């Protein structure tokens, strides 16, 4: 059976056009950091039994007070902000005078590629943050009583200069005139980071459950 070449070309063009019109659109993933995400999986417990975990990660847009320069730095590092299993509102982005009284300083936990880092941003130097601690997202996990799924147990908070002066364990800090950073593993340990003349002191302050 012979067919006119022009007819064949027309039929092929019609098939290609129909395919182009009916093909489903390619899926589009949301831009990085624009939506809340869950990091989940299983880890081995102390007795070797697998335990499930689920860590909530909030986008930077959940923290509208963050200065744009800091948002840019965190975005470059592909950061999302991990939330503790106790969180009732966005947390783990804090503000205070961490190197001088009244300074416009910030600190944030940044989760990226399975690792969380505690960054501090000093006023006037937002483009050169300091990393105080970095560890796997799953290093510190915990849960509320009665819950079987673990969540992040890493939380940070601002400790004011007045709170520092009221605590006897900070006596070796010679001059307390500005804020510090509480760096806690919930219900277990608490480290207080204090910038003393450009050097960060890490002071163990006992169990977080005592504060």
Predicted regions and their residues:
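Bacterial N-terminal signal peptides that target proteins for export
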Residues: 1-11
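Bacterial N-terminal signal peptides
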Residues: 9-19
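Acidic, small-residue rich beta-repeat scaffolds with periodic aromatic anchors
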Residues: 20-61, 137-211
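Short, non-transmembrane alpha-helical segments in secretory-pathway proteins
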Residues: 58-87
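Acidic, divalent-cation-chelating loop motifs in proteins
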Residues: 93-101
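Acidic/hydrophobic-patterned starts of short beta strands in beta-sheet-rich repeat architectures
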Residues: 100-110, 173, 177-181
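Structural motif
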Residues: 114-120, 190-192
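Short edge-strand/loop segments of extracellular domains
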Residues: 123-128
């Amino acid at each position: 059976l012979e067919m006119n070449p022009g007819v064949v070309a027309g039929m092929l063009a019609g098939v290609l056009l129909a395919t182009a019109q009916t093909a489903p659109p390619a899926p589009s993933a949301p831009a990085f950091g624009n939506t809340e995400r869950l990091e989940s999986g299983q880890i081995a417990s102390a007795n070797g039994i697998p335990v499930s975990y689920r860590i909530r990660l909030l986008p930077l847009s959940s923290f509208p007070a963050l200065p744009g320069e800091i948002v840019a730095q965190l975005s470059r590092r592909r950061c999302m902000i991990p939330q503790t299993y106790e969180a009732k509102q966005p947390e783990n982005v804090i503000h205070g005078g961490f190197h001088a009284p009244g300074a416009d300083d910030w600190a944030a936990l940044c989760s990226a590629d399975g690792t969380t880092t505690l960054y501090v941003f000093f006023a006037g130097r937002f483009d050169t943050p300091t990393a105080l601690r970095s560890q796997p997202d799953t290093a510190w996990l915990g849960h509320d009583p009665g819950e079987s799924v673990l969540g992040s147990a890493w939380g940070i908070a601002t400790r004011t200069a007045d709170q520092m002066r009221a605590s006897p364990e900070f006596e070796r800090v010679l001059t307390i005139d500005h804020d510090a950073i509480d760096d806690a593993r919930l219900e277990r340990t608490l480290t207080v980071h204090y910038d003393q003349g450009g050097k960060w002191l890490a002071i163990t302050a006992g169990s977080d459950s005592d504060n």
